[in-house]
Amino acid sequence: MTEYYGTLQKRPLEQESVAEGNGGLESGKKARGDSDVFAARSPENEDVDVDADADVDADADADADAEEDAQKDILEETKADELDEVVDEYEEKEVSSNFNGTASDHVGITSSNTGSTALAASSADTNSGSGNGTGTMATNGTLSDRQYAPQKPEHPIKLERRSVSRKYVFPVISKEDSLNARSYLKQFGSARFLDDYLPEDLNSLYVYHMIKLLGFQIKDKELMLAIQEVVHNADNDDSLPQKNSSETKNVSDTYTATYPSPSFEDPLEKKHAVRLIKDLQKAMNKVLSTRIRLTNFHTIDDFVAKLKTAKKIIVLTGAGISTSLGIPDFRSSEGFYSKLGDLGLNDPQDVFSLEVFTEDPSVFYNIAHMVLPPENMYSPLHSFIKMIQDKDKLLRNYTQNIDNLESYAGVEPEKMVQCHGSFATASCVTCHWKIQGERIFPNIRNLQLPICPYCYSKRLEFFKTKTDEELADGEDDDMDDHHGRSVPKSFGVLKPDITFFGEALPSKFHRLIREDVLQCDLLICIGTSLKVAPVSEIVNMIPAHVPQVLINKDPVKHAEFDLSLLGLCDDVAALVAQKCGWDIPHDNWNKLKNKVFDSEEVERGVYKVHPLNESPAELEAEEEKHLPLQQSTAALTPPVSLSADSPGRSSSSSPQPPTQTDIANNQTST
């Protein structure tokens, strides 16, 4: 590949690549050595004087410099195309009839008829190739501990050419070929990948085929038209490949294997060849920066089998696991943030901004009741995690939720990392006095600021409480500066120990995640859209051979999950538990245990799960019908800080003095 790129740089520019008109034509001629300048040095003109000869040499040098500049321009100005990922559109190979055992015993080659998988009977170093020179995925060991290594191609890619038309024919690329090539690139690196897949002599069409082999399609119409001009494409299909090597071996009188000649007569213009190289670089970078789905793990049965053998499961959870309890998620179309549009906030996420809270905590406390967790309640999904823990399979539950419901379900503190904190405790932003979170729940439900008893008297000095009559008269109740000192409105306010935007994640997260990702043998992401870093990066930290499963209402397209189970989290958990023969320790399990679920495969590795005879649309309508009041926008009240000049402003932002009993209890708890 490096030699090809070097040869390409030395290749004369085509006439169209330099300029239009006579000037471009002359430049092209000079580059090929057939211009009038060189003709003047023929034997008949040997009497040309030295000065004239020097002038000719100077002109030739100038032309060479101009040519070199033009070469640099085209290399520097050519940009890579936008690439469409099409690996999922490739056909799957049929399972070979000489495999022994059932389909569930093998992995690697997928049957397009049944969706089951089979493993090539060869070892990892067996050279079994296809028309693309790619092999199948080989493994050793049991299903639970197999390590999946991509096969080295039997031989470099070899393009064939029709004898009469002299047009090229590309081998057919299967999904397994593409996945193997992508895995080979990721495991062995760019240099070995190019050395093993490409012949020593190649042209630009080999580069195009490599882009296709990695699962990408070029979008540039001009470039595609140029390729179609030199490629046999009987069906006028943009994807171009027509026959595989097994078909062409029997028609040697029609097709001939071909490698480029040393004279380097590339079928495409240089500008197209340069673009293809840059497109290949872009495709390789995309592959190297993303996870590759496992070819042997894409069915519910694969998930069930792995659950039974896994010992170090990481469960990553989000707000979707609590929606069945009436707690809204955050980022869906019906989620928490979408409902905050009525509040007039520039950015709904401002309610969880540390900077905004410091300036005016009433912004948060006017909506906090909407996300306040129910006490001593948990969903079947929470109990599903507890079940995994009880079977000694749970390495860690990394939860993005702030409701602390996992603890109610019985997940042990050492098995749980609350990545974004929780309502379990609350702390004074001024003196950092800490109490149990449930003690400020009444304040939250009444839209009141909970005030630290130790900072209460000092806060009264800074912020005098105004009566409704004084507020109606327009008197300012804010005293942001006391004796020349700036005092934030959050002075003495108790804040739930949830991680706001602008705050660092708990040290426990950073301490454990580095070790856990190396031990993990199965990752299950549940009820999360994976939009918030650094928690969203966990999927990219897991070793490539570890299966990743998504259980969520909607797909997460920016991640590469091996298996996605789309539906209500409780339903999916019930289906999986049924197939495992396990009981979920939840009061509703007897009902869920006898429920029949339908799993519809919408594409490879993606299933929609819903109760039998109930469509997903019917389930969604039924779910919305029973939404609790706390998800209704009618329960929202504008934050006090947004209507400060209004005479009808709520007085709920005024500090509520704790009772003597409260102070006594608080002092006792310390």
Swiss-Prot record:
GO terms for molecular function: histone H4K16 deacetylase activity, NAD-dependent; metal ion binding; NAD+ binding. Residues 69-81 have a biased composition (Basic and acidic residues). Zn(2+) binds at residues 428, 431, 452, 455. It catalyses: N(6)-acetyl-L-lysyl-[protein] + NAD(+) + H2O = 2''-O-acetyl-ADP-D-ribose + nicotinamide + L-lysyl-[protein]. It comes from the Eukaryota. SUPFAM superfamilies: DHS-like NAD/FAD-binding domain (SSF52467). GO terms for cellular component: nucleus. Residues 1-157, 235-263, 617-670 are annotated as: Disordered. InterPro entries: DHS-like_NAD/FAD-binding_dom, NAD-dep_histone_deAcase_SIR2_N, NAD-dep_sirtuin_deacylases, Sirtuin, Sirtuin_cat_small_dom_sf, Ssirtuin_cat_dom. Residues 96-119, 239-261, 659-670 have a biased composition (Polar residues). Residues 45-68, 82-92 have a biased composition (Acidic residues). Its EC number is 2.3.1.286. Residues 120-142, 641-654 have a biased composition (Low complexity). PROSITE patterns: SIRTUIN. The active site is at 420 (proton acceptor). The keyword Transferase applies. Belongs to the sirtuin family. Class I subfamily. NAD-dependent deacetylase, which asts as a key regulator of gene expression believed to help form modified chromatin structures on the genes it regulates. It is involved in telomeric silencing and in hm mating type loci silencing. This is NAD-dependent histone deacetylase SIR2. It comes from Kluyveromyces lactis (strain ATCC 8585 / CBS 2359 / DSM 70799 / NBRC 1267 / NRRL Y-1140 / WM37) (Yeast). The lineage of its organism: Eukaryota, Fungi, Dikarya, Ascomycota, Saccharomycotina. The gene is SIR2.
